[in-house]
Amino acid sequence: MAYQEPNKDGFYGKFGGRFVPETLMTAVLELEKAYRESQADPSFQEELNQLLRQYVGRETPLYYAKNLTQHIGGAKIYLKREDLNHTGAHKINNALGQVWLAKRMGKKKIIAETGAGQHGVATATAAALFNMECIIYMGEEDVKRQALNVFRMELLGAKVEAVTDGSRVLKDAVNAALRSWVANIDDTHYILGSTLGPHPFPEIVRDFQSVIGREAKQQYRDLTGQNLPDALVACVGGGSNAIGLFHPFVEDESVAMYGAEAAGLGVDTEHHAATLTKGRPGVLHGSLMDVLQDAHGQILEAFSISAGLDYPGIGPEHSHYHDIKRASYVPVTDEEALEGFQLLSRVEGIIPALESSHAIAFAVKLAKELGPEKSMIVCLSGRGDKDVVQVKDRLEADAAKKGEAHA
């Protein structure tokens, strides 16, 4: 099938669009115009490619996880190692592209939201590189959970604003960043960190992240001599690492695509972030997408052990893939993600981010189902350094509970 989403109004099927107040429409249209101009200018992409190579360290390897594959005894698992990028995750692909775009637009200041802190660190890094002022909005809860990343951002010259509204997490940080953008439109560019928000943000983020899938596609051929893998797996919060892996394969219908959503304490509890499993269409942050909401359309709080996945919506293109049945979205609990985190560390010597651990956990299940004749690419979206203390505390608490139960 020929895939040409989004349309000129920013819709992916029935999802997407730009539902923004008049005050923001000018900025959004200005951004789209600048982005189209940059797409038509070969020097923009050449400069970006050079930065991705020399500064970020791309291309990232596609690594055959032989030990993990043998441990499971199922399909061959190839890891797309986005954890090896400068700053430790896929977020830099988009941050660098957007800061470079903002610089060309003549903007002086960069603002961004962040959950786990990875997008904040990536944005602060790119702003430092281009010598631009940078303010990062972060929910107060996440500031506590990710103290190390907060210090990193400050070290890189950014100012971190703790957001105390609402549930003090990622969605509240997005609200605060959007408000700030409205107030400072002339000299400020807002860098959305995922495939969310009003058009053209989901398209821009997808395009900058699609380097993941483009590289992986070619690397898979070079490594295996085969044309295509049987499946792709990536974790999904807002969905930027997943869309980056999936989009270059979207027309290859033989390739099954799986997004691993955060099921938290379980999809039948109130503590999860499984948007496509439990959500329904609604407008959030300027875009029509699937969102977790109550009977009255009020946005519900999302919950996950992983700060980067507890967003109550999902990128509109993922909602579209789900709607047309091009991709499947599967819930993975905190507990399963913790098992994935430990398993990959133990058998491959690679400590994954808690976000990526959701993808690993589902890949283990899928590998058993597919069997040894098949193969898959899993996006290892980030490294787990930022999560080690949290996991240590959680495992120690779990062990103490078990001890009490046996006493």
Curated annotation (Swiss-Prot):
InterPro entries: Trp_synth_b_CS, Trp_synth_beta, Trp_synth_beta/beta-like, TrpB-like_PALP, TrpB-like_PALP_sf. It catalyses: (1S,2R)-1-C-(indol-3-yl)glycerol 3-phosphate + L-serine = D-glyceraldehyde 3-phosphate + L-tryptophan + H2O. The beta subunit is responsible for the synthesis of L-tryptophan from indole and L-serine. Pathway: Amino-acid biosynthesis; L-tryptophan biosynthesis; L-tryptophan from chorismate: step 5/5. It comes from Streptococcus pneumoniae (strain ATCC BAA-255 / R6). Tetramer of two alpha and two beta chains. Belongs to the TrpB family. This is Tryptophan synthase beta chain. It comes from the Bacteria. Keywords: Amino-acid biosynthesis, Aromatic amino acid biosynthesis, Lyase, Pyridoxal phosphate, Tryptophan biosynthesis. Its EC number is 4.2.1.20. The keyword Cytoplasm does not apply. CDD domains: Trp-synth_B.
